[in-house]
Regions:
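A short, charge-rich alpha-helical start-of-domain segment used by transcription regulators
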Residues: 2-31, 41-44
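Acidic, proline/glycine-rich intrinsically disordered inter-domain spacer in sigma factors
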Residues: 9-16, 20, 94-120
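The N-cap/first-turn positions of alpha helices
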Residues: 26, 125-126
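Structural recognition of an alpha-helix C-terminal capping motif at a helix-to-coil junction
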Residues: 31, 45-52, 56, 65-77
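Arg/Lys-rich amphipathic alpha helix in sigma70-family domain 2
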Residues: 72-94, 106-109
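DNA-recognition helix of helix-turn-helix
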Residues: 76, 80, 146-176, 189
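Short alpha-helical "packing" element that flanks the helix-turn-helix/winged-helix DNA-binding module
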Residues: 113, 128-130
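Helix-turn-helix DNA-binding module
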Residues: 118, 124-125, 132-155, 162-166
Length: 190
């Protein structure tokens, strides 16, 4: 994030920027936050908090290099903070249920696969990487969200892909390919 005090965009321009970004990214951020939180309410709060903070930063003249990954990271941090507060306050978590994937996704079986990731034996980090990758975040964006190196993200996704293929079979190979787009194009071109 850069601070450029003399380059504050007009308020109407910021509002349009936020509205356009919301239209493009809100669904993915909401799905990710819901899967992470296991709470629809917390996911909506995380989404609102992420876009509110984005608006405040932009209104203060700050430039955000990668708005998509920045928003995912803010939503993730919000959910994790809420989980910590909830745990400290000993709020009952048993009433929370999994949040279904919004209907705009055609791959219902892909969503079922995502719900089964813990049973396949994926680590929490691998699961987070897979969920973010299915929201079309690039390796560097996932790295920014999770505070990892892009190479680590690649290794986690490769390991997750191998575990998924082993558990589900090779038929899932093209449906759930987490490879970097260039590597994927090379592999399927041959």
């Amino acid at each position: 994030m850069d601070r450029s005090p003399g380059s504050q965009p007009p308020a109407a321009g910021i509002e349009q920027e936020v509205a356009d970004l919301y239209e493009r990214e809100a669904g993915g951020i909401l799905r990710y936050a819901a899967a992470l939180a296991n709470s629809r309410e917390t996911a909506h709060d995380a989404l609102q908090e992420a876009f509110f903070r984005f608006f405040l930063c932009r209104s203060a003249g700050q430039r955000i290099r990668s708005p998509k990954s920045w928003l995912f990271r803010v939503a993730r941090n919000y959910v994790l903070d809420q989980k910590k507060k909830s745990f400290r306050n000993e709020v009952g978590m048993e009433s929370l249920s999994n949040v279904p994937c919004p209907a705009h996704r055609d791959e219902a079986d892909g969503f079922e696969l995502l719900q089964g990731l813990p049973q396949i034996g994926l680590s929490p980090r691998e699961i987070e990487c897979v969920r973010l990758r299915t929201e079309d975040l690039r390796y560097d964006e996932i790295a920014g969200v999770l505070g990892l190196q892009a190479g680590t993200v690649g290794a986690l996704l490769a390991r997750a892909h191998g575990k998924i293929r082993k558990a589900v079979g090779d038929g899932v190979h093209k449906k759930c390919d987490f490879a970097h787009p260039v590597a994927r194009e090379r592999r399927y071109a041959s």
